[in-house]
A protein has these predicted regions:
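Sec-dependent N-terminal signal peptides
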Residues: 8-14
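Residue-level detector of solvent-exposed, low-hydrophobicity positions
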Residues: 13, 95, 100, 114, ...
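Bacterial extracytoplasmic/cell-wall-associated proteins, especially those involved in peptidoglycan
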Residues: 203-329
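Intrinsically disordered, low-complexity sequence elements enriched in Ser/Thr/Gly/Pro
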Residues: 1-2, 232
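Primary recognition of N-terminal secretory signal peptides and signal-anchoring hydrophobic helices
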Residues: 2-7, 18-219
Length: 329
C-alpha cells in the first residue's frame, strides 16, 4: 500500500513537472516578445529622433542657403534710389541728379543728368578753372562755375541765375541740359512731376545754327553800343534789337533794324561794319540769337545811355537800368 501511494505521488510530481515545463517556454516566449516590442519601440524612437535632427538641419539649411554669385552681387550692390518727380521717358530719374530749386528754376547736376540721358556721357573736372566738361558720342558740354551760360556743341545757352555748385558738383538748369541733349521738357502742374523725353541726343552745332549775317551785325551793334558793359547789359541791347525784329512797326531783320533811319547812330557811314567785336560781345550775340532773354527787358524796344533828354526818356516808361543803360517799353 505504501509503495502504491509513493508511486502515485511520484507520478503526480512528474505530471506537475511536465506541466511546469510547458509553462516556462510560454513565459519565455512572452518575455522575449515584450523585449522585442520594447526594442522595436526604442528603434522607432531613435529613428524619429534622428529624423527630427535631420529635419532641423534641413530647416536651418533653408534659412541660410548657400549664396549664388548672382545673389552675392545683388547683396553687394547698393540700393538704387530715384527721384520720383523727374521722369525720363516715363521712368524715375536717379537720385544722383540732385534736383534743387534756385530762384524758381529747377537745377540738376550736369554730369549726373547727362549720364541719365546718355549712358556714354563722361565728365571731366578742371579744378583750376572750376569747369566741368561732359562728352558723349554726339555732344560736348562745358560749364564753368559762376558763368551765365553753358556751351554745348558751340552753342551758347543762357543761365539767368548763373552756373552753380552743390555738394561738390556743377549745377545747371534742367531746361539747359534737356536743350543740349535735344530732349523735350514738360511740367505737370497737377502732380508737380517733370517729364523729360529723349530726342536725338544732341542739339544742332553752332556752326550750323547761327546765321552768319545775323551774328555779324548783332555782335557789332552789341560791341558798339555796350562793349564795356557787363554780359547781361550787352545781352539787353541785343534783346532790344530782336524785340524790334519781332514787332510789326519795325523792320523784320537785324540788319534792317540797325539801318533804320535815326535809330542807331553807330550804324551810320559804315562805321558799324568796320568794327571788330570783342569776345564778350560775340558771346552775348550768340546768347540772344539762341533765345537768351534778360527778363527785365523782354518787352523793351528802346534804350539810351542814361540820357534824360532822349525821345524814349521823354515818351516811354523806364523798365530797368542795367549797367550804363536805361531800357524802355
Amino acid at each position: 500500500m505504501k509503495r502504491k501511494l509513493f508511486s502515485m505521488l511520484l507520478s503526480a510530481f512528474a505530471l506537475l513537472l511536465l506541466m511546469g515545463a510547458a509553462e516556462v517556454p510560454e513565459q519565455a516566449e512572452l518575455i522575449l516578445a515584450q523585449e522585442e516590442s520594447v526594442a522595436v519601440a526604442d528603434e522607432q524612437m531613435l529613428e524619429t529622433e534622428i529624423q527630427l535632427e535631420v529635419n532641423d538641419v534641413s530647416a536651418e539649411g533653408e534659412e541660410m542657403p548657400e549664396a549664388t554669385d548672382e545673389a552675392r552681387q545683388i547683396a553687394e550692390e547698393p540700393a538704387v534710389l530715384f527721384d520720383e518727380l523727374v521722369l525720363i521717358d516715363g521712368q524715375p530719374a536717379p537720385i544722383e541728379i540732385g534736383r534743387i530749386q534756385n530762384a524758381g528754376t529747377t537745377y540738376v547736376s550736369l554730369a549726373a543728368m547727362a549720364k541719365a540721358l546718355d549712358e556714354s556721357a563722361a565728365a571731366a573736372w578742371d579744378g583750376s578753372t572750376g569747369t566741368v566738361t561732359v562728352t558723349t558720342e554726339k555732344l560736348t558740354i562745358t560749364a564753368r562755375m559762376g558763368d551765365y551760360y553753358v556751351v554745348a556743341n558751340g552753342r551758347y545757352l543762357y543761365v539767368a541765375e548763373h552756373v552753380g555748385q552743390n555738394n561738390g558738383t556743377i549745377m545747371v538748369p534742367l531746361s539747359v541740359v534737356t536743350k543740349a541733349f535735344d530732349a523735350t521738357l514738360n511740367w505737370d502742374a497737377a502732380t508737380g512731376t517733370i517729364h523729360v523725353r529723349r530726342g536725338s541726343g544732341a542739339l544742332m552745332s553752332g556752326d550750323a545754327f547761327y546765321n552768319q549775317d545775323d551774328l555779324f551785325w548783332m555782335s557789332r551793334v552789341i560791341y558798339a553800343e555796350s562793349g564795356n558793359q557787363p554780359l547781361e547789359g550787352r545781352m539787353a541791347v541785343g534783346n532790344v534789337v530782336l524785340n524790334r525784329v519781332a514787332n510789326p512797326i519795325f523792320p523784320n531783320t537785324i540788319h534792317g533794324v540797325l539801318a533804320q533811319r535815326n535809330q542807331f547812330s553807330t550804324y551810320k557811314g559804315g562805321k558799324l561794319a568796320n568794327r571788330t567785336p570783342n569776345e564778350g560781345s560775340i558771346i552775348a550775340a550768340k546768347l540772344v540769337l539762341d533765345g537768351g532773354v534778360v527778363e527785365e527787358v523782354k518787352d523793351a524796344l528802346w534804350f539810351d545811355a542814361m540820357c534824360s533828354n532822349s525821345w524814349a526818356a521823354r515818351h516811354k516808361a523806364c523798365l530797368v537800368i542795367i549797367g550804363g543803360h536805361k531800357f524802355y517799353g
